[in-house]
From Swiss-Prot:
EC number(s) reported in the record: 3.6.1.27
Descriptive protein name: Undecaprenyl-diphosphatase
Main location: membrane
Note, other: Bacitracin is thought to be involved in the inhibition of peptidoglycan synthesis by sequestering undecaprenyl diphosphate, thereby reducing the pool of lipid carrier available.
Primary enzyme class: hydrolase
Family: Belongs to the UppP family.
InterPro entries: UppP
Species this chain originates from: Streptococcus agalactiae serotype Ia (strain ATCC 27591 / A909 / CDC SS700)
Entry's Gene Ontology molecular function annotations: undecaprenyl-diphosphatase activity
Key words, A-Z: Antibiotic resistance, Cell membrane, Cell shape, Cell wall biogenesis/degradation, Hydrolase, Membrane, Peptidoglycan synthesis, Transmembrane, Transmembrane helix
Any Pfam family: BacA
Transmembrane regions listed in the UniProt entry: 45-65, 85-105, 113-133, 188-208, 226-246, 255-275
Length: 279
C-alpha cells in the first residue's frame, strides 16, 4: 500500500537528515535500515533513492548559509564579497580529487563494498580513527580557526580525504571533518567547510545517479515520485535542526562520542550478520 511506503519514506528521510551531517555515514545507515524495513520498490529505484534524497539535506545548507554563501548578497562589503568568492574557489578546488579519483571508481566500490560487513568494518575503523585523532589533538592548538585563513592547499587536501568516503560506511562528512582536523583546522572550520563542500559534491553525485537511472530506461511512477518527494522534504526539515545542532555542539565538544557510536554500531552489525548466517 502507498501509505505504508510513504511512512517508510518518512522514516528514511529522518535517517538521512540526521546521519548526513553527523560523521556516522548516511548512506550506510540507509542501507542498514532497509535491511529491516525495505521499500517495496525495484532495486534500481532504491539505489537511486538512497542518493537523490540527499538533495533535501543539501537544500538545508543552502537555506541556512544563503547569505554567507551568496557573493551578491545586498549589504556585503567589497572584502566580504572577495572572501565569499575565495570560499567558493576553495570548495571547487576541494572537489577536484573526487572528480579525478572517486567518480571513475564509484560503481566498482558500490558493487564490491555496499554490503553489511564492509559497512560495519568501515564504521568501526573510522570510529577508532576519530577517537585517536581527538586524543592526539587534545592539547594541540588549531592552526586554522577561520575559513578566510584556510589556504587553497588545505582545501585540496581536505578534498583528498573526501575521496575516502567512496567506501560505504565511511561517511563523507566524517572523512572531511577528520581530514580537516588532522591537517590543523578547528572543529568549527572543519564542520563548516564540510557543509559547504557537500553542496557541489552531493548535487553532482545525486544528479549523476538520477541521470543514470533514467538513461537505463527507468521511469518514475506517481507513487515513486511521492515516495522520493516525502523523503527529501523530511530530510530537508530534519537537516535544518541537525546542522544547527552540530555547529553549536562542536564549539564545546569533540567528536569522540561519534567514534564510540560507530564502533558500537559496527560491532552490533557484525554480530547480527554472524547470527543470521551461522545459526
Amino acid at each position: 500500500m502507498l501509505i505504508i511506503e510513504l511512512l517508510k519514506a518518512l522514516f528514511l528521510g529522518v535517517v538521512e537528515g540526521v546521519t548526513e551531517w553527523l560523521p556516522v555515514s548516511s548512506t550506510g545507515h540507509l542501507i542498514l535500515v532497509q535491511e529491516f524495513m525495505k521499500l517495496n520498490q525495484s532495486k534500481s529505484f532504491v539505489e537511486m533513492f538512497n542518493i537523490v534524497i540527499q538533495l533535501g539535506a543539501i537544500m538545508a545548507v543552502i537555506v541556512i548559509y544563503f547569505k554567507r554563501l551568496n557573493p551578491f548578497q545586498p549589504g556585503k562589503s567589497a572584502r566580504e564579497i572577495r572572501l565569499t568568492w575565495q570560499l567558493w574557489l576553495k570548495v571547487v578546488i576541494a572537489c577536484i580529487p573526487s572528480i579525478l579519483i572517486a567518480l571513475p571508481f564509484d560503481n566498482w566500490f558500490e558493487a564490491h563494498f555496499n554490503f553489511m560487513i564492509p559497512i560495519a568494518i568501515a564504521l568501526i575503523f573510522y570510529g577508532f580513527v576519530f577517537i585517536w585523532v581527538e586524543k592526539r589533538n587534545a592539547h594541540l592548538k588549531p592552526q586554522v580557526t577561520e575559513l578566510a585563513s584556510m589556504s587553497y592547499k588545505t582545501a585540496f587536501l581536505i578534498g583528498c580525504f573526501q575521496v575516502l568516503s567512496i567506501v560505504p560506511g565511511t561517511s563523507r562528512s566524517g572523512a572531511t571533518i577528520l581530514g580537516a582536523i588532522i591537517i590543523g583546522t578547528s572543529r568549527s572550520v572543519a564542520a563548516d567547510f564540510t557543509f559547504f563542500l557537500a553542496i557541489p559534491t552531493m548535487f553532482g553525485y545525486s544528479g549523476l545517479k538520477a541521470v543514470k537511472y533514467f538513461l537505463d530506461g527507468n521511469v518514475l511512477s506517481l507513487d515513486q515520485s511521492l515516495i522520493l518527494l516525502v523523503a527529501s522534504l523530511i530530510a530537508f526539515v530534519v537537516s535544518l535542526y541537525v546542522i544547527r545542532f552540530l555547529t553549536d555542539y562542536v564549539k564545546r565538544h569533540d567528536f569522540t562520542i561519534f567514534g564510540k557510536y560507530r564502533i558500537v554500531l559496527g560491532s552490533l552489525l557484525i554480530l547480527y550478520w554472524l547470527v543470521v548466517h551461522l545459526f
